Amino acid sequence: MKVPFKWLKDYVNINISANELGDRLTLSGSKVEEIISSGDEIQNVVTGKIEKIERHPDADKLVVCSVNIGKEEPIQIVTGANNMKEEDIVPVAVHGAVLPNDVKIKKGKLRGIMSNGMMCSEKELGMPESGVDGLMILPSDTAIGKDIKEVLDLDNAVIEFEITSNRPDCLSVVGIARETAATLGIKYTMPKLDYTPKNKANIKDSLEVEIRDDLCRRYMARGVKNVKIQESPEWMQERLEEAGVRAINNIVDITNFVMLELGQPLHAFDGRQITSNKIVIEKGKVGEKFATLDKVERTIDESVLCIKDGDRAVALAGIMGGLNSEVKEDTKEIILECANFDGTNIRVSSKKLGLRTESSSKFEKDLDPNLVEIAMDRVCHLIEELDAGEVMEGTIDIYKNPIKERNLKVDSNWMNKFLGTDISKEDMKEYLDRLELKTDVEGDTLNITVPTFRSDIVLKQDVAEEIARIYGYNNIPTTMFNSVSKRAGKTLKQHLEDKVVEILIGSGLNQSISYSFVSPKIFDKILIPKDNDLRNTVKIKNPLGEDYSLMRTTTLASMMEALSRNYSRNNSYARLFEMGKVYIPSQDEKVLPEERNTLVIGMYGEVDYLNLKGILENLIEELNIEKSSYKRESEHPTFHPGKTAKLYVNKEFAGLLGEIHPDVLDNYDIDEKCYIAELNLDVLFKNANIEKKYKALPKFPAVDRDMALLVDDEVLVQDIESIIRNKGGKILEDVKLFDVYKGAQIPEGKKSVAYSIVYRMPNRTLTDAEVNKVHDKIVRTLENNLGAELR
């Protein structure tokens, strides 16, 4: 935000330079980005009196002037201007002078006559043109030889501030004046607000206002009759120009002036155009066309808040007025609007419409609704002062939920301990009073009343920040901590997550990351039925778009998107995993959704179900999860029936793994088989143990036996393994499946499964007879229970 230094001095008596003030304000928390001095572009231009004018001997349109610039001898200047006479005082750019736009002046000959400089016009000095064609003629009592910047008061600095979103009270010249006064320990003066309605007509008799949406927190309207549209006074135009705002006419300029001065946007409607005598504040209609003051027709929708004349939009609330209610040269009656709107809605609407204005940039920060009346009074005062019209009697003010001051109690001893200072409570009170935080001291307690314009002060820590910045951060002594800080370590969950990543990358997988918000269309793509609980989602109020409008309840679609993207780019294989969250809504709206930590693994290309299962078994083993089992799953719509399993850990459901249903693959344009596992990490981590346990190497040899069985295709390998472990007894050390085969030499409807079995006792050597007895028992049980045949 740009604040002209001269304008700032209208409200606070500053006796230091703009640069020094910038340094002081930056140290007190109001960051100064840049200080621009308008006079820096002008160098070596002084006032001079024309003592003699003679015709140029070789040019009819040129004259030769003798100009006194306060030196011992006058200088000679050749010019083509013709609006000056002898004894006139003019700006003179001498040899070596610099003018705006980096124009350098050098002495030289014009048609054979030496010219030692140039006499300047208003345009050449970069000043607003008054309409005079030719040189700038200065008052006759102007001192000779003076720097033109001093004479014309051109040496005005503009200070540019970076205003953070939590300080909307600083989005104005008065707000910066308040900060300046607090920083320098002096008083500041509020602008005059008093006025007397000169027109006895009451606006309440001719206008009605209705707020139909809570996005408008307050709306105030006043009327002005017998309006005189004319140019604003020079001082106002100058202030606006310095702040980067173009002067238009007195009414528009007054509203812009007050917006910059107090930080509260206002708008003036041509009273003739409010034909329904009723202003309505409500959202627009889908596809509604509306032409704004910049003469651009825009399409609005039901999310954009509008100011309407009955059913007809006349302004985009908080953004820009409409061309259909613009104040014109023949306007005789205006309706003044001063309101407060929801900042989030203004920001979203402004972005959607591609229209960001000075007004919207202020409303985006959530302004204080109590500023509305102050700004309206100020506008009425200026209309009266500039004789721009007659303010009507009465005020329409709709303010349903008034914002009130906040009260805080802070212990002064806590404050010093928190800041590491030794500030007296009396000084604390003084610092807070400077910032208009009215403070009473009661013992060691500071009773603070926070004004409504300081919405950022909520906690005692916020008060501490205010005291620290006025006291001076640079004045706070450097001290050692009173306590010993301990370096924070990772949580068990973080260690487990790191372990999972390490295991899966070691298994040849690549980690992927996807958005947690998804499209409603994903459920159809992965064949989730309409009544399935997975479709009960958390909906985002302000989504980036429909494709990102829901919080996901499953990671299956996210992984399918990743596999599809790889497949579409002709990658012959993909091995991916992602650790993320799914969001399960609570039945009670007051309870936050459950955030479930999830691991999803996806792959295609020269892999099968057993590859995926092997990765999971390795993961379970590395996490030291003791009891895991699998059960057939045939009902999940996303997976191929008969080629899917449920994983249980300690009898608790931990996830699904299997081959993806062909119809799902078609929906993602994938022509290869894909395999996915979706696991509940919370269940895995609850049963994991990453502490390393060591045991002595076995002292006695093991007996290894391989077993190849012919079984029906429907027999689960888990059932086979369960029998082996149960019947193996205490001498069984380990059992592993190492082959599953179907094809040549295997009857139809059958499969061959092969296991490696290890027998061992920790305290003695096993005999062949002992091993054979147990091994034969296992084979008989498999034959009797599962119809297995030993190959």
UniProtKB/Swiss-Prot annotation:
Entry EC no(s): 6.1.1.20
Primary location class: cytoplasm
Domain (FDX-ACB): residue spans on this chain: 698-791
Domain called B5: residue spans: 403-478
GO MF assignments: ATP binding; catalytic activity, acting on a protein; magnesium ion binding; phenylalanine-tRNA ligase activity; transferase activity; tRNA binding
Keyword field contains Acetylation: no
Subcellular location: Cytoplasm
Required cofactor(s): Mg(2+)
Gene Ontology cellular component list: phenylalanine-tRNA ligase complex
Residue span(s) of domain tRNA-binding: 39-149
Subunit-level organization: Tetramer of two alpha and two beta subunits.
Database matches in NCBIfam families: pheT_bact, YtpR
HAMAP family: Phe_tRNA_synth_beta1
Name the record gives this protein: Phenylalanine--tRNA ligase beta subunit
Organism encoding this protein: Clostridium tetani (strain Massachusetts / E88)
Organism ancestry: Bacteria, Bacillati, Bacillota, Clostridia, Eubacteriales
Gene: pheT
